[in-house]
Amino acid sequence: MTGDRGRLISSKLLEHKTAYQVDRELSGTILFFKATYGASIYKLVYETIDPDGKPTIASGTVTVPKKPDFALPILSFQSGTMVKRDEASSTTGFDGNYGIVAMWTSSSGYLTVIPDYLGLGESELFHPYQMAQPNATVIIDMLRATRTFCDQEGLETNGQLFLTGYSEGGYTMMAAHKMIEEEHPEEFTITASAPGAGAYDMSGVMVDLMLSGEEYPSPFYLPYTLFAFDEYYNLWESPSDFLKEEYATLLPPLFDGTHSSSEINAAMPAVPMEIMEPDVVDAFSKDENHPLREALRDNDLYDWAPQSPMRLFHSTGDDLVPVENSRLAYETFQENGATQVELFECDCGTHGEAAAILLFLGFAWIESLADKSQPLSLNHHTVPEKYNLLSVYPSPFNSSTKIIFTLKEGSEVTLTVHDLLGKEIETLAKGRFPGGRYEFPWNASLFASGLYIITLKRTNSQGMK
């Protein structure tokens, strides 16, 4: 059972900023530039599936440039590691790191999509941290919900789809790129992707780093991964089966979605593996087919061949996700026949220090590929913002069809059908309607075959199809 994946459940305007306000927000950061457009951020709640394939809900944000004169490219940005549920984009809006990204990209002329992921925002599941399939599906379903949102709001996109993200967002972006090309090539076409500093080799590079016995700046990464994989792969009966008694009691409550990563790090030893039972570590180290190792191997993302342009970004000084992850992915992609993949390395500092720099460089590359010259269609130039006549579906039709329109506020509305001579032949709706989405059927079996004009009139405004 997969439910109605990508069905938009609700959308809500969270905040609007003018171009001047965006300039003030970004002033003094590496992302500073002259904003071209204001930006409005919306919270979306939509239907998706959990790691077991059962229907569930997820949330995210869509940020829209204000009044561009061209059809919009879509930029899907995947956020980095979060453990606190209310740190997600749909909760923070324009506040926080991801609000800055949304302002920056949308005020440059992109319709910016930021999924919250399962287990964050509205989702009450445990976040499937560093797991490819559930994160890819929630990203893809967010894109589907965004498509519906654009229809409802009368937003015109140009068919370009860019993917990017950093850290966990680099990993989840890679998972989404792979799934789109392998499972949904007829539904989505990726223009280009720019993954940054993702842990694409979970079973190799990242395992070796943890087993090294060295201190690690963000030790909470290890229990986050262990709890997620145990939750969805059923590796152990209880935390005490793999964690030392002290940590089996202390750590699970800290991952309930109400605690920050800094709180969890404060409860962790500097060497992450010290939380685990030595016999479990020993068994894992010696067994290439250990269930945990097999589960990690299932979620490696380096052994395939991207077909769309991709540029990987990574700092050689990354202290959390070694650059070897991107090097291995790049080399394997080439060996597998990929011809449009590049690797950009720089000595940009640690994982945290490099984030803004690499995101900026990735966005600059995306900017070089984006098409912002496609003019809006006639309907989008002439239909006022307060309402929108969305579609007549099916069209053409045999004997019946339905007309869909939206109102952003309560209005007096008349929906009529005219022939090509301008004669009104039927009134489908007339009266005052509250804001919302409406569908009206039209049975045309009593009229001759031909072309007809659907007219939606609102006070002092008119739209036609």
Residue ranges and their predicted role:
Residues 1-69:
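Catalytic-loop region of hydrolases
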Residues 52-59, 65-104:
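Short, surface-exposed "cap/lid" segments of acyl-processing enzymes
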Residues 311-318:
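Short beta-strand/loop motif that positions the catalytic acidic residue
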Residues 196-303:
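Accessory cap/linker subdomain of secreted extracellular hydrolases
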Residues 129-151:
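Alpha/beta-hydrolase active-site loop
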Residues 381-393, 397-465:
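C-terminal outer-membrane/trafficking sorting elements
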Residues 144-216:
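Primarily recognizes the serine-hydrolase "nucleophile elbow" in alpha/beta-hydrolase
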Residues 293-294, 320, 327-374:
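C-terminal catalytic histidine-bearing segment of alpha/beta-hydrolase fold enzymes
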